[in-house]
Design a protein with these regions (language model features):
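Positions that flank functional sites
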Residues: 33-34, 169, 218
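GST-like domain detector, emphasizing the conserved glutathione-binding G-site
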Residues: 1-133
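Short, hydrophobic secondary-structure boundary micro-motifs
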Residues: 80-85, 107-109, 163-167, 192, ...
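A short, terminal or domain-edge coil/loop segment
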Residues: 82-91, 114, 136-146, 213-227
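Long hydrophobic alpha-helical segments typical of transmembrane helices together
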Residues: 189-227
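A general structural signal for well-ordered secondary-structure junctions
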Residues: 25, 50, 79, 104, ...
Length: 227
C-alpha cells in the first residue's frame, strides 16, 4: 500500500494533494511535531534515516524529498495529465519550477525563519542589539531583495499564463504552491502580487486540494516573518 508519512504543518500536504489529483489509492500515517522544538518526532527516523517529511513508502520502496516524490508519483501513477510532453517549452518550464520551489525559494524561506528567530530570541541585554544588528544587515542586504526578486519573477510568469508551465495545470504548480503560501505570510499578495493571489485562489478552489485538506488536515505556516 502506498503510504504518505504526513507531518503536521509541513510540505507533505502537497503530496496528499498530488495523490488526490492522480486519483491514486493511498493511506496517511500522521505525525505530530515535537511541542518544544517544533521538529519532526523521532518516530520518523524509523521511516527514513533523516527523519524528515515528506516521505512516502510504496511497497518496499521509500522515497523522500518533495521533488523526488513528485517525480516518482507522476512517473508511476500519472496518465499524462500532470506533466507536459517532453521536449516542449512547457516541459522545460515544468522542470525549472519543479526544482525552483525547493532549490532557490525554499532556501530563502528557511533563512527568513532563522532570521526571525534571531530577531525574537530571548538574549542577554548586551547581546540583543548585536544579534538584531546582524540580522538586520542580512535581511536588508540579502534576504528581502532576493525574496522580492523571486516574487517579481513569479508574478511576471503568472502574468503570461494561468499556471507556471502555461495554460495547463501540472505537478509543478503543486510544487510551487507551498512557496507562494509561504510568501502570503510575508506580504499582502492581493495588492502587491495579484497574479500570485489569483494562483492561490485557483488552487484552493480545486476539489483535490480541498480533499487533501479534509484527509491530511489544515496546516499553518508560522515563523516566516513579514517585511
Amino acid at each position: 500500500m502506498l503510504t504518505v508519512h504526513h507531518l503536521e504543518n509541513s510540505r507533505s500536504h502537497r503530496i496528499v494533494w498530488l495523490l488526490e489529483e492522480l486519483g491514486a489509492q493511498y493511506e496517511i500515517k500522521r505525525y505530530g511535531r515535537d511541542k518544544e522544538t517544533g521538529l519532526a518526532p523521532p518516530e520518523m527516523l524509523e521511516v527514513h534515516p533523516l527523519g524528515k517529511a515528506p516521505v512516502i513508502t510504496d511497497g518496499d520502496k521509500t522515497v523522500a524529498e518533495s521533488g523526488a516524490i513528485i517525480e516518482y508519483l507522476v512517473y508511476e501513477y500519472d496518465e499524462g495529465r500532470l506533466k507536459p510532453e517532453e521536449g516542449t517549452a512547457e516541459w522545460r518550464a515544468y522542470i525549472y519550477w519543479l526544482h525552483h520551489a525547493e532549490g532557490t525559494f525554499a532556501s530563502l524561506m528557511l533563512l527568513s525563519l532563522v532570521i526571525g528567530r534571531i530577531e525574537n530570541a530571548s538574549l542577554p541585554f548586551f547581546a540583543k542589539p548585536i544579534a538584531k544588528g546582524i540580522a538586520s544587515k542580512v535581511r536588508g542586504g540579502y534576504l528581502d531583495p532576493n525574496v522580492k526578486r523571486n516574487l517579481d519573477f513569479m508574478e511576471w510568469t503568472l502574468g503570461k499564463s494561468k499556471w507556471f508551465c502555461g495554460d495547463r495545470f501540472t505537478a509543478a504548480d503543486i510544487q510551487m504552491s507551498f512557496a507562494i503560501e509561504a510568501a502570503e505570510v510575508r506580504t499582502e499578495l492581493s495588492s502587491n502580487y495579484p497574479n500570485l493571489a489569483g494562483f492561490l485562489d485557483a488552487i484552493r478552489a480545486r476539489p483535490a486540494y480541498k480533499a487533501a485538506l479534509d484527509k491530511g488536515g489544515h496546516y499553518e505556516l508560522t515563523g516566516i516573518n513579514k517585511n
